[in-house]
Regions:
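Bacterial Sec-dependent N-terminal signal peptides
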Residues: 1-28
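Conserved functional micro-motifs across diverse proteins
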Residues: 18-202
Length: 202
């Protein structure tokens, strides 16, 4: 009887761990994914550069495009549209400034970095499995802020390939952008992506 009770308890814990957490608003879900212990946000400091890699759940993109939160059909349409991809925000800062501000006096470095950030991130960033199977980047968005923010922020988009998410984790790497950091590697747990948090729209 005790053994059966223990089994049921373990089963309940497992099911709870695999369930999608649901939040009432964007503030709650944003705070949740910011906490490193929840495995959606990863931070590293290399050679003074603060790297923050954060997964962006599907429903945050749905919410940005949704006008009527009671329109269930529209909600499902937008979820179908966005859940085909995985979205990562990569933030980098040095001396509490965006990266370009730190090379503004060197025209050669400045020009190369502008080119890398605006056009070359598919060559600078990689996502791959422990078996070194690399997933091709679908898109990236770099909004140049002209020194108006204290970090360089890029949204990087990958196809949501189920074969890659069968692994326990995947690697996300950023090549050296000219600050002698070497390759910066993040180990991302896939279970949290599969069971990403959701918003309660109505």
């Amino acid at each position: 009887m005790v053994q059966k009770s223990n089994y049921l308890l373990l089963l309940l814990i497992f099911v709870s761990a695999c369930a999608n957490k649901t939040f009432d608003n964007t503030e709650e879900i944003t705070e949740y994914i910011k906490e490193e212990e929840n495995n959606y946000c990863y931070k590293k400091n290399i050679e003074g550069i603060e790297y923050i890699l954060q997964y962006k759940p599907t429903d945050l993109l749905v919410e940005q495009e949704l006008n009527d939160k009671t329109d269930q059909k529209k909600i499902e349409q937008l979820r179908d549209k966005y859940k085909k991809y995985m979205y990562f925000n990569l933030s980098m800062s040095l001396n509490n400034q965006e990266l370009l501000s730190n090379v503004a006096r060197d025209k050669s470095k400045f020009g190369q970095m502008v080119n890398d950030l605006a056009f070359g991130m598919e060559e600078k960033v990689n996502l791959f499995t422990p078996k070194n199977d690399t997933l091709a980047m679908a898109d990236f968005i770099y909004p140049r802020m002209y020194g108006m923010t204290n970090n360089t922020s890029i949204m990087i988009v990958y196809p949501r390939d189920k074969n890659y998410l069968k692994e326990d984790y995947i690697y996300f790497t950023v090549e050296d952008l000219g600050f002698y950091t070497g390759e910066v590697k993040f180990k991302i747990k896939t279970l949290e992506i599969v069971n990403e948090p959701q918003l309660r729209f109505n």
